[in-house]
């Protein structure tokens, strides 16, 4: 069957439960030492394997969550606003890592995001949700969709079209990268990305 890896938006590590990264990664997992070492190197967490989970920075913790999701060699990697709680530098580093994994692994990626700029510049397909599927398709098609324009306005649609045009020239991946843009909260966008509009709609992933 389809193997799915999931990276949540955040994980609150309780300092009263002193679990180390190495132990956390292998909880309910069958990965051996060699597999763990490979994934740790892939996600740049080799140096923090013996650190307690609760002392990690936001970026370190997200890489650990990503590593755990990759241990099972998923066919589909689901990322739920994985960089929302990171600073700009951390976001760039995390998404660069995602692009590297996407390029090197036989994996499809579904990312939920409110970052329209990210969605339009790095995804192959966008699904825009606002209580229902408003529009979907390749980024340049979505930015021209009447419902997208109605949600975000002409100025935002034109700006996003610039990002999608640049993406059309730069993106040469061969497998699926789906971005869901979620409008349920403040606007943003995703890769193979899904865009969900569940809460207040604010033009901004």
Regions found by a protein language model. Name each.
Residues 92-104:
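Helical segment within the ABC ATPase nucleotide-binding domain
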């Amino acid at each position: 069957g389809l193997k799915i890896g999931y990276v949540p938006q955040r994980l609150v590590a309780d300092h009263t439960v002193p679990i180390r990264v190495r132990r956390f990664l292998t909880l309910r997992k069958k990965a051996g030492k060699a597999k763990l070492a490979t994934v740790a190197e892939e996600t740049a967490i080799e140096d923090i394997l013996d650190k307690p989970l609760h002392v990690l920075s936001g970026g370190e913790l997200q890489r650990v969550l990503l590593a755990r999701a990759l241990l099972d060699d998923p066919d589909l990697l689901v990322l739920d606003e994985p960089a929302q709680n990171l600073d700009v530098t951390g976001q760039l580093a995390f998404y660069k890592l995602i692009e590297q994994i996407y390029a090197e692994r036989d994996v499809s990626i579904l990312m939920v995001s409110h970052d329209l700029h990210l969605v339009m510049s790095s995804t192959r397909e966008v699904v825009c949700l606002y209580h229902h599927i408003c529009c979907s398709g390749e980024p340049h098609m979505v930015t021209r969709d009447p419902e997208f324009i109605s949600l975000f306005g002409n100025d935002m649609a034109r700006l996003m079209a610039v990002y999608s045009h640049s993406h059309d020239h730069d993106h040469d991946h061969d497998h699926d990268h789906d971005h869901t843009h979620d409008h349920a909260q403040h606007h943003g966008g995703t890769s193979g990305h899904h865009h969900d509009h569940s809460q207040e709609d604010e033009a901004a992933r």
